[in-house]
Amino acid sequence: MESFLRGDYHVHSTFSDDAVSTIAENLAAASAAGLTTIRLIDHVRASTEWVPEFLAAVAAEPVPAGLTVLTGVETKIMDAAGTLDLPPDLVVGPGGLDAIVIADHQFPGDTGPWSPTTAREKLDAGLPVAEALDLLIDGYIGAMRSVSAGQLAHAFSILPKVGLSEDDLSAEQLERWAAAVAETGTLVEANEKWACPSPRVLQAVITAGGTIVAATDSHIASDIGRYTEVQALLRAVVPGKVVGA
């Protein structure tokens, strides 16, 4: 587990409006923490125009010895088809981003994103839990299949916000989701900030042949590479395919 925790695949900089540390500060903190890999990511939506400047800023920073620096942008799933809230001209691969980080910031409804309040209202009005979860699973799968290199940020963190939990996922739903994770080569975070996904979900990823990475979701450099919740999650999972393990 120790080598697994030497990666931090979800680190925000001041390119995100809710983060306080610069790219340089993040790299210095990662090096000081003894990390070997860091993924620098920031929040985007379809109207975002600064991704080239973000990539240029990352490229301009000297990389500390022994540290691999990856890039990405974090974007939300918009609907059950897996539409992502991304700028239309993004480049993923050589000359561009290393990955798209997919997040369930809102609930992917059948015709667009639902706020947690809207999702709760629909459930209270009679939307069956299984049908709601199918929408979420479909959204995840569509999103994963729409990108060439993906990573799931704090998977299923939307569920407590709408009055549900990961325990509400059926075995079939979880297996279908995990199979798509493995099929698409999407990385799945064990996320420190949100303490998710659960050991059951992480185990499903491993069983399906998917890959788990450690992530703090840090918005300040002092949090980079500091894991408590992730260690607890991983202790409950049978050893499997985790980066660095």
Describe the function of each predicted region.
Residues 38-40, 100, 152, 188:
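Hydrophobic residues within beta-strands of alpha/beta enzymes
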Residues 184-189, 194, 215:
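His/Asp/Glu-enriched short active-site or ligand-binding loop at hydrolase and phosphoryl-transfer sites
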